[in-house]
């Protein structure tokens, strides 16, 4: 992968990650928690979501170490207070689902544009490969975030589904799997 390819993927992944994080804050606010707004994070402004390590340093490091074959980036997680949510059991799951759902919707919109390409003038058709990469990147982000390992969104969905009697298991999984993530 060349430096231009790195920048190309970076320009696709970072906005998708920002929209993903914004969706978490948006859903939390809809469910009664204004924390993201108070923290200045209920915005699509990239400056509010860029994490020095996860958005800049780590992707560049991985790109260099892998010889240009691998890159991974993430945006700062949007804060929310689950105790402010109207529904304490399902609220955190709804906030968690909002991020991957935003990636799915982005992928669906760009897939629809690809499908509609024949309607547009041939000069527009050259955007199809770009749109395909956007679809692929967003589906990849969605699937990755649905993995049920803390702190990923899938774990919050799983924890909402687990019965309350499994609270100790949930707490243990959160504690130890979050350490593995770090």
Locate predicted features.
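Hydrophobic transmembrane alpha-helices and their immediate loop junctions
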Residues: 1-180
């Amino acid at each position: 992968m060349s430096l231009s390819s790195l920048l190309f993927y970076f320009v696709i992944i970072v906005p998708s990650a920002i929209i993903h994080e914004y969706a978490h804050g948006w859903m939390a606010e809809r469910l009664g928690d204004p924390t993201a707004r108070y923290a200045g994070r209920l915005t699509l402004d990239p400056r509010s979501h860029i994490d020095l390590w996860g958005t800049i340093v780590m992707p560049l490091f991985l790109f260099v170490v892998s010889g240009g074959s691998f890159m991974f980036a993430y945006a700062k997680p949007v804060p929310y207070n689950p105790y402010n949510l109207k529904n304490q059991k399902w609220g955190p799951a709804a906030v968690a689902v909002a991020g991957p759902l935003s990636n799915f919707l982005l992928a669906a919109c760009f897939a629809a544009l690809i499908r509609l390409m024949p309607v547009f003038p041939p000069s527009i058709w050259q955007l199809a490969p770009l749109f395909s990469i956007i679809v692929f990147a967003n589906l990849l982000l969605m699937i990755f975030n649905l993995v049920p390992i803390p702190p990923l969104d899938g774990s919050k969905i799983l924890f909402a589904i687990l019965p309350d009697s499994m609270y100790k298991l949930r707490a243990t999984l959160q504690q130890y799997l979050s350490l593995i993530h770090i």
